[in-house]
Regions:
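Pre-NBD coupling/linker segments of ABC/ABC-like ATPases
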Residues: 3-46, 237-241, 245-248
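Conserved ABC ATPase "signature" region
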Residues: 23-33, 116, 128-145
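A short, surface-exposed alpha-helical micro-motif characterized by mixed small hydrophobic
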Residues: 215-217
Length: 249
């Protein structure tokens, strides 16, 4: 269902990034703008290098590794948010990504408005969102905050809203980055149970977490990534044990 072939992602640290018209304008006024910037090709690093693995339909794959290992970058590549420097990704199925809190939200809009905005981003019709609106609100536990701008939400509240919208229908492929570790314990457990329901229904899951207990509970196999390179792929308990020993080492 998901196949990664020799994925590499290179970041050039020697290039100034003028990502917006506003920043370019500021740079011109300050004299920092140079038309002919030279790339420092020797000043780069590989966030991912030579990553190969396959995920079958219905598998729940955990992605573990230290901070900066390249896990979030890999999720963005699989989701199509980022294009790899080298290699290719084949995905057969519709992806529902939960990789950044607030991605797909307009923080100035209310929770009510963002249900429709984020739902549209995920490909849901207005008719479906109308039908599922009360279900989303009930699951998110945010009924009293429907008309509050999301910019005033805590990270936990934002996570609740994002998860509740993304899971109103069972996606073919669910990509989750640490979202189950955000929010109160009650919601974490409720989210975990919801994921278990989707897994039983055949949803394919790629799941990043530093919580090895959660990885052990949910995942059928694990990919251990370190410094952008796959260290091990295999049985959940074996790979988690090896990773834990390396960290305690």
């Amino acid at each position: 269902m998901i196949t990664l072939n020799n994925i590499g992602m290179k970041y050039n640290l020697g290039v100034e990034r003028d990502n917006s018209f506003k920043q370019t304008f500021i740079n011109v006024l300050s004299g920092k703008h140079r038309k002919n910037k030279k790339k420092k090709e020797d000043n780069f690093f590989w966030a991912l290098k030579g990553v190969n693995f396959h995920i079958d339909k219905g598998e729940v794959v955990g992605l573990i590794g230290s901070n900066g290992a390249g896990k979030s970058t890999l999720l963005k590549v699989v989701s199509g948010v980022m294009k790899p420097t080298e290699g290719s990704v084949q995905v057969n199925g519709q992806i529902s990504p939960m990789i950044e809190l607030g991605a797909g939200f307009d923080m100035d809009l209310t929770a009510r408005e963002n249900i429709y905005l984020n739902g549209a981003v995920l490909g849901y019709s207005k008719e479906l969102l109308d039908e599922k609106f009360d279900e989303i609100v009930e699951f998110s536990e945010l009924r009293d905050f429907l008309d509050v701008p999301v910019k005033n939400f805590s990270s936990g509240m934002t996570a609740k809203l994002a998860f509740s919208i993304a899971t109103i229908v069972d996606p073919e492929i669910l990509i989750v980055d640490e979202i189950l570790s955000v929010g109160d314990i009650k919601f974490q457990e409720k989210s975990k149970n919801k994921m278990m329901e989707m897994i039983k229904g055949g949803t394919t899951v790629l799941y990043v977490s530093h919580a090895l207990d959660s990885i052990r509970d949910l995942c059928t196999k694990v990919v251990w990534l370190e410094h952008g390179v796959v260290q091990e792929i295999g049985d959940t308990n074996e790979v988690c044990d090896h990773y834990y020993k390396s960290q305690m080492g």
